[in-house]
């Protein structure tokens, strides 16, 4: 899972 915009 990712909570950043640059995944």
UniProtKB/Swiss-Prot annotation:
GO terms for cellular component: extracellular region. Does not elicit gross behavioral symptoms when injected centrally or peripherally in mice. It is found in: Secreted. It comes from the Eukaryota. The modification 6'-bromotryptophan is found at residue 6. The keyword Secreted applies. The cysteine framework is C-C. Expressed by the venom duct. Coiled coil: none annotated. It comes from Conus imperialis (Imperial cone). One of its GO terms (molecular function) is toxin activity. The modification Cysteine amide is found at residue 7. The keyword Zinc-finger does not apply. The lineage of its organism: Eukaryota, Metazoa, Spiralia, Lophotrochozoa, Mollusca. Disulfide bonds join 2-7. Keywords: Amidation, Bromination, Disulfide bond, Pyrrolidone carboxylic acid, Secreted, Toxin. This is Bromoheptapeptide Im. The modification Pyrrolidone carboxylic acid is found at residue 1.
């Amino acid at each position: 899972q990712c909570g950043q915009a640059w995944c």
